[in-house]
């Protein structure tokens, strides 16, 4: 078998799992990512529909502290909640978990935080925080327009560690997740 044939087999059988939360954490635009994958002949085998937490970090100290305190309610020991900060100049700072981000919370160069906490996809606002739900909507709109995978999976797994005000009956929560995704695909 020649190299081109082998490469074709690999690209047919080794495919990418597009986790919407992970790409959103890195501030990647869904259409640009999918275009680049296509340009390289790489296929998406599965989309994991998931949302991260995010918030702009104001320069005003009191407003900034309110945002940081809101993130603190999501600090828990079961999962790592990596934080990727975007600076005002457009650079990225990676923190391995929330405590390291909290230690740098007064960094005035940081304009936004995104945290790897798979929050329910059906909620956009976690006042004063929000989610990366818009990225999910963008991916699903692209899937509707020109399907690029047959495998969609909702990947919220943090039900047991959500702050108390966000907890609901697990059956109801999962049903809401699936209904929300179906609504996006039907619109």
Residue ranges of model-derived segments:
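Flexible, acidic glycine-rich loops studded with aromatic residues
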Residues: 43, 87-186
């Amino acid at each position: 078998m020649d190299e081109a044939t082998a490469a074709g087999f690999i690209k047919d059988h080794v495919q990418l799992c597009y986790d919407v939360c992970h790409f959103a954490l890195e501030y990647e635009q869904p259409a640009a990512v999918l275009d680049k994958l296509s340009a390289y002949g790489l296929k998406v085998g599965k989309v994991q529909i998931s949302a991260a937490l995010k918030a702009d970090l104001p320069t005003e100290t009191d407003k900034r502290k309110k945002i940081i305190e809101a993130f603190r309610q999501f600090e828990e020991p079961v999962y790592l909640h990596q934080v990727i900060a975007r600076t005002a100049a457009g650079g990225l700072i990676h923190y391995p978990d929330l405590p390291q981000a909290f230690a740098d919370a007064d960094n005035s160069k940081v304009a936004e935080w995104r945290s790897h906490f798979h929050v329910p996809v059906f909620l956009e606002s976690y006042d004063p925080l929000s989610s990366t739900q818009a990225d999910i909507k963008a991916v699903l709109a692209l899937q509707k327009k020109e399907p690029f995978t047959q495998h969609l999976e909702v990947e919220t797994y943090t039900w047991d560690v959500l702050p108390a005000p966000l907890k609901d009956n697990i059956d109801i929560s999962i049903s809401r997740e699936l209904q929300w995704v179906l609504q996006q695909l039907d619109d």
